[in-house]
Amino acid sequence: MEQLRKHLVNSLKGGQAFVPVEKAMNNISRAARNKKPDENLHSIWEELEHMRIAQEDILQYMINPEWKSPEWPEGYWSRPVTDLSDEKWDKTFNGFMKDFIKIIDLVNDPKIDLLAIIPHTTAHTYLREFCIIVEHNAYHVGKIVDIRKALNNW
C-alpha cells in the first residue's frame, strides 16, 4: 500500500507525464492571468478556478458526508470577470494549493484504505477519487500551459 501511496503522490504532483502545477503557475504575468488567446478558450484564471472548484468538490466528497456538489456544469465554472484583482487571483491559487496539500495528506494517511469504498458512498473508492483528481488536474494544467504559450507567457 505504501508504494501505491507514493505513486499517487508523484502522480498528483506531476512532472512525470505532465508539467507540475507549481511550474505551470510559476511567474504568470498579471496581464496574462485573465487574458484569453482566443474567444473560444478560457483564461488561465478561469481554468485554475475551475480546477479549484472541482478539486474542492472531490476532496469534500471524500471527507464530508454532508457535502453537496455544485450543479453540473454551471457550478464548476465561474463567470468570466473583466477585472481580475490580485486578491481574487490569490484566493483562487491559494485555495487550490490548500486543498491540494489536504489531498496529499489524505493519500498519505495510513488510516485510509485506498482500495476501500468511502464509508458514506455506495460504490466509490478513495483510489478512484484520487485518480480523477490526477486526470482532471493534468488535463487542465496542460490547457494552462497551452494558454500561456499562446500568450507568449511560458
Label each residue range with its predicted role.
Residues 4-12, 18, 22-25, 30-77, ...:
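Short, contiguous alpha-helical
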Residues 80-117, 128-133:
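Acidic/histidine-rich alpha-helical segments that form the ligand environment
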